[in-house]
Amino acid sequence: MAEALYYGGRQRQDQPRSTQLVKATTAVVAGGSLLILAGLVLAATVIGLTTITPLFVIFSPVLVPAVITVALLGLGFLASGGFGVAAITVLTWIYRYVTGKHPPGANQLDTARHKLMSKAREIKDYGQQQTSGAQAS
């Protein structure tokens, strides 16, 4: 009944006819069930859209501004939360800097402060020289 066949150097056993029939029947039943289910979902979608579309058209002058308002409110709360977190982070950094705990970036701040102070001193000295020279003449 089951013969050994050779394909590509490998032995392959033919399956009995009853096994093939069961596999085919299972595939047809599963495929048919899924096809029927897909058709029912499509029909329900069409019926739902047909009944809901007039309501969307009637209420769209209310729904569109409501959606925009809700979106803006959500973005506003998100932005305020982000700004709050940023403010807390900055205040924590300032507290650590003032208490001498040397937060990240403190060296850069000190370097920039010293450069700014030296430039301000140079400008002050230059201004004093100019005014003393103008008063002498």
Swiss-Prot record:
| A Gene Ontology cellular-component term | extracellular region
Coiled-coil ranges per the record? none
* Disulfide bridge map: none
UniProt KW keywords: Acetylation, Allergen, Lipid droplet, Membrane, Transmembrane, Transmembrane helix
- Principal location class: other
The membrane topology noted for this protein in its Swiss-Prot or TrEMBL record is: Multi-pass membrane protein
From the Swiss-Prot or TrEMBL record, state where the protein is found.
Lipid droplet; Membrane
Q: Which Pfam family, an example, fits this chain?
A: Oleosin
Query: Which residues are modified to N-acetylalanine?
Result: 2
On tissue specificity, the annotation reads: Expressed in seeds (at protein level).
Record GO biological process: lipid storage; post-embryonic development; reproductive structure development; sexual reproduction
Which residue spans traverse the membrane? 27-47, 55-75
The family this protein is said to belong to: Belongs to the oleosin family.
Task of the protein: May have a structural role to stabilize the lipid body during desiccation of the seed by preventing coalescence of the oil. Probably interacts with both lipid and phospholipid moieties of lipid bodies. May also provide recognition signals for specific lipase anchorage in lipolysis during seedling growth.
What protein is this chain from?
Answer: Oleosin Ara h 11.0102
What is the species listed in this Swiss-Prot or TrEMBL entry?
A: Arachis hypogaea
